[in-house]
Amino acid sequence: RYGIHLASVFRSGDFVPHVRMPATGKESTSLASLFGLPYVLTSKQRNFDKKTLTYNWQINGTDAFSVYSGETDNIDVNLARKAVSAVLRFLTRMGILKYNCHNGYIASIIEEEDLVSVKASAPGFLRRFVTINEEVNRGQLLGEVINPYNGEILSEIRSTADGIIFY
């Protein structure tokens, strides 16, 4: 049994399309890789996870996956198509239906606690210099926080690690 949850609405902002699974001890990252999305993200259990659909599916013997398309604040037709293709790709690979599509990505498996949060030191308008899924180096300028009243730069935001912009 498989449970596929299209969950993008629960995370605000833009992010790399990925499959997310709570680490219950019953998760299967190898099955999650069959969606062909660039990343499979596992996360340690938090108190509220016990009330989520995917957690309860997994605990009760269903292979459960949350598919995050990459956009929540707007309708992005291209990202929606990629999410639909990922689900159809998975169902085809599991022998449930036949659908012709490209192979997708070889997924990188990452754990949520390996993601590094970068925060601004001041409030204001954000001027981004990098985009989602862009590779960055430690110390690289990611953006600036601008004073909304006079346009002055209040703060610079720099990468604290080498990697990609995930969220």
Go through each PLM region and give its residues.
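Structured catalytic-domain cores with a bias toward divalent-metal coordination
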Residues: 1-167
